[in-house]
Amino acid sequence: MKCKVYTVVVPNVQSATLLPIIREKVKPDSIVYTDTFRSYDVLDVSEFSHFRINHSTHFAENHNYINGIGNFWNHAKRHLQKFNGIPKEHFELYLKECEWRFNNSEIKSQISILKQLVKGSLV
């Protein structure tokens, strides 16, 4: 199964900020794999089955990986470097473009979607 990402710029990375976003995007009773970042501790007492992957001790324990997000960030950084800097007020739009490109990684799919968007805007 191909990893899909959802990106959003947040004012901080505290649990109180992250949990509502996670609840909005992830179905209850889903299995959620995270790294050991402290803000994810709240997931232990949430409606999700939460499992932590400690990169330094168990990179792929029981075949459960979180490297999909690492893969996304590698793609995003490579794409964003081409611009030699991005205005802060437009960063979220550039990030959303990276999300779209990652979630629709096949060029044929991207072209098809873009054609549909162009046709829709001409009507």
UniProtKB/Swiss-Prot annotation:
Keyword terms, alphabetized: DNA recombination, Transposable element, Transposition
Alphabetical GO biological process terms: DNA recombination; transposition
Coiled coil: none
The UniProt record lists the keyword Protein transport: no
Lineage: superkingdom: Bacteria
InterPro entries: IS1016-like_transposase, Tnp_ISXO2-like
Keyword Calcium applies: no
Family: To insertion element IS1016 transposase.
Protein name: Uncharacterized transposase-like protein HI_1328.1
